[in-house]
Amino acid sequence: MSYLPTYSNDLPAGPQGQRRRNNGNENDARQGYGQQSVPMVIRRLFKTPKNLDLETASWEMFHLIFHPRKAYRSIYYQRQTKNQWARDDPSFFIFQIALISLSSIIWSIYNSGFNNDSDMGALSIIGHFFKSLVMMVILDFFIFGFIMATIFYLLLNRSHFKFKSSQNSVVEWAYCFDVHCNSFLIILLCLYFIQFLLLPIINLQNWISLLIGNSLYCFAIGHYFILTFYGYNQLPFLKNLNFILLPTLGLSIIYLISLFGIDLSKKLSFYNY
């Protein structure tokens, strides 16, 4: 009876051959990540609906909001089974786009009628919807996400941020974009939905409305960087990541100063598109 070989015939057996095989696997992985990581983000969207794991996406969204560490621990097990850090299922991404689109509808109705004191016509609502959709999805989510993912991809693949034993490890661009998607969830929740519910208070133009509006914006943006830190801190080959939390320190200072009369909800104004 013949058996399949457990190692290549052109490599010696033993520790030396194993090291050469490992080096070859690492080189193949690096080439694959460099050539396919960005296109993979696009290819994920063309899976059939029956292959979408909506239950897992819902679980991830819930725990990213309430238990972010637990959500990121699941990524480690994905790495063990699928040999990649980035998601291979677009369900989370599709969920997020759907929620942003829903918020665009809500804010387009508000902006076309209640906010601008204009007639609530169907054409006005549709116009505001497409304008809001383009600004929220293209500008706020995609362009901002592309910039953040690219910055961290270029930065964290430098040797300064890797342990000496893991210099050949690569931070995938697709994973960097996944981290952005995870972190953007809190902005989506706080500024796209909760802010809408709190508009009657935020629009009162007093110190209480100033406090609530500024707290909401600073919490959402600050939490974006905290979740970003959790995401990259999950990678076992990275180090010196505390710099990711520096924007939260700056936001804390801005928040305290803003309480003396600077309305951040009006200055940043996510929805006056």
UniProtKB/Swiss-Prot annotation:
Pfam families: UNC-50 (PF05216). The chain crosses the membrane at residues 90-110, 135-155, 176-196, 217-237, 243-263. It is found in: Golgi apparatus membrane; Endoplasmic reticulum membrane. The modification N-acetylserine is found at residue 2. GO terms for biological process: vesicle-mediated transport. GO terms for cellular component: endoplasmic reticulum membrane; Golgi membrane. The keyword Calcium does not apply. It is a multi-pass membrane protein. Interacts with GEA1 and GEA2. This is Protein GMH1. It comes from Saccharomyces cerevisiae (strain ATCC 204508 / S288c) (Baker's yeast).
